[in-house]
From Swiss-Prot:
InterPro entries: AcCoA_carboxyl_beta (IPR034733), Acetyl_CoA_COase_Trfase_b_su (IPR000438), ClpP/crotonase-like_dom_sf (IPR029045), COA_CT_N (IPR011762), Znf-ACC (IPR041010). Keywords: ATP-binding, Cytoplasm, Fatty acid biosynthesis, Fatty acid metabolism, Lipid biosynthesis, Lipid metabolism, Metal-binding, Nucleotide-binding, Transferase, Zinc, Zinc-finger. It is an enzyme of class 2 (transferase). Its cofactor is Zn(2+). Pathway: Lipid metabolism; malonyl-CoA biosynthesis; malonyl-CoA from acetyl-CoA: step 1/1. The gene is accD. It comes from Pseudoalteromonas translucida (strain TAC 125). This is Acetyl-coenzyme A carboxylase carboxyl transferase subunit beta.
Amino acid sequence: MSWLEKILPKTTKASGRKEIPEGVWAKCTSCDSILYKAELEKALNVCPKCDHHMRISGRKRLEYFLDEGDRVELGTQHEPKDVLKFRDSKKYSDRITAAQKSSGEKDALVAMKGHLKGIPVAAVAFEFSFMGGSMASVVGARFVDAVDQCLEHNMPLICFSASGGARMQEALISLMQMAKTSAALAKMTEKGLPFISVMTDPTMGGVSASLAMLGDINVGEPKALIGFAGPRVIEQTVRETLPEGFQRSEFLLEHGAIDMIIDRREMRDTLARILAKFMNLPSTEQEHRVA
């Protein structure tokens, strides 16, 4: 032992590097900032560094949006069926099972009724993680169930779209949902009940070509991709470079395709004020309540 080792205090080796539990941190998909997940969830999955609106599940979106305590889910009796016995690289029934397992949902639309700042409403939200939020028979059935509740109880309807379009595995059945949902919304118009469409990233295909663009007010979240065919498909077809930001909500607002852009963190307050004006309701939450 050297003289230096004799005069220095003995040290012990660390038992090992402490592992950080999984799920504590998240990475912004826009600016790559590392974010504390609990704080990100409080901000409704909007990055506090760059304000990028990350995708969230349809169920979580409705839980953020509707008042706590009296939310009732609609259309739970509807479940997908492989009527056509469709098969591509795998069976449609197997795709349904896999999507249900990965998303935790039975199909691509969650529908609820409840209150928004005391105003009785029905709200639906697409679940993009379920086969790209594709519109199929169950989506149409649940959407119509929500409309029927609005017609019965004189309530407005809010829809949060996040979809790649019609579900090819249901062929013509999925395309018929475009007409089915549009016809249901026509009944809302006849009765003078507001329908607000909120288009989130992405809202494409048959959904954008039907119910998503039929709102009395059409809203986009910041930088949401909204259109029919995607920009790459269009560029390959027309053989031209598209303008910067083409099909983003800011581009659509500038060209009059949507009415407004609302930050997700301000969605509840803004839509509650709009609905109060639409329905000639008092401004206080208590006065909106139905006896």
